[in-house]
Structures are given as C-alpha cells and as structure tokens.
Amino acid sequence: GLGDVYKRQIKSELTNPKLAWMFENCFPNTLDTTVRYRKTDGKDDTVVYTGDIHAMWLRDSGAQVWPYVQLANQDPELKAMLAGVIRRQFKCINIDPYANAFLDPYDPNPDHQWMRDMTDMKEGLHERKWEIDSLCYPLRLAYHYWKTTGDISIFDEEWLCLLYTSPSPRD
C-alpha cells in the first residue's frame, strides 16, 4: 500500500513496540478512512473528509495529507492522490474564496446542515466561515508538492482562475 516502505523503515527505527504499533496504524489512517480519490475529466481529483463529517475543510485537508508529501516521488498513487487534493482545493476556492468547508460533489447524500447560515451560501459549500488559513494551507501544500515533485501540472486553469477570484486587500 501507500507508504509501505516508509512505514517499515520508521517502524524498524522505533525501539518502543507500542510506539511502532501506533505509527504503523496511525500513519496510513487518513488514506484508509478519509481520502476519496477519483479521476474527473482525466485529472486527479481527491476529496479528503475531515473525520466523521463528509465535508472537506481547506485547512484540515491540507494538514491531513501533509505527512505524505515527502513520499510523493516514491509512490505514483500517492503522488496522484496529492495532486488531486490540490486540484480539489483550487476548485473549492474558485467556488467561494470566503468558504472554509466544501461538500463532496459526488456524495449522493451531502450534509446541508449549514445552508441556513446567514451568509452567501452557494451550491457545493458545507460551511462559509472564512479564516485566513483556509487560503494559506492549500498554497502551502501546492508549493511543497511542487518543490518535492517538480510537477507543474497542478498549476492549470483552476490555479489561474484562483489567482483572480481570491480575496484581495481591496475586498
């Protein structure tokens, strides 16, 4: 599976058996429980749920996959999943740069509990509670993914659109 070589390496370096067991079970947890990878229009597209809530927070999804960036060049599936997270984050920001959480567009039963919020809720949003880290985490992930892999394919039309839709000091 994803990151198996890395897991074995780290586990072999840990002398405490409980800590080794915890790492082996915790490290792949995001991949096993919250990642929803697919191809959309021939491009990698990954939604990362935040725990038990079937929605994707920009900050949390970036933090959840962050430990895997260092392994992207060792595993093509992991690299594709990460590229998909970045593309999905860019798409989300383009839906609404002031939102912080988004619904999975392929979820047949999305959770619309916040649609009555007194904000400009749009289709595809889970929550519209803007925080600056909602924009910082996707940029951090994209930058470090690019620096690690050299892959510029993530900087496509969604990226260009994001540059023009993101909040500016004039807003």
Across the structure, where does each feature detected by a protein language model lie?
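Short, small-residue-biased leader/transition segments that mark boundaries at the very start
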Residues: 1-6, 167-171
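Low-complexity, Ser/Thr/Pro/Gly-enriched N-terminal "stalk/linker" regions
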Residues: 4-59, 84
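Aromatic-rich carbohydrate-recognition surfaces in CAZymes
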Residues: 54-82, 86-166, 170
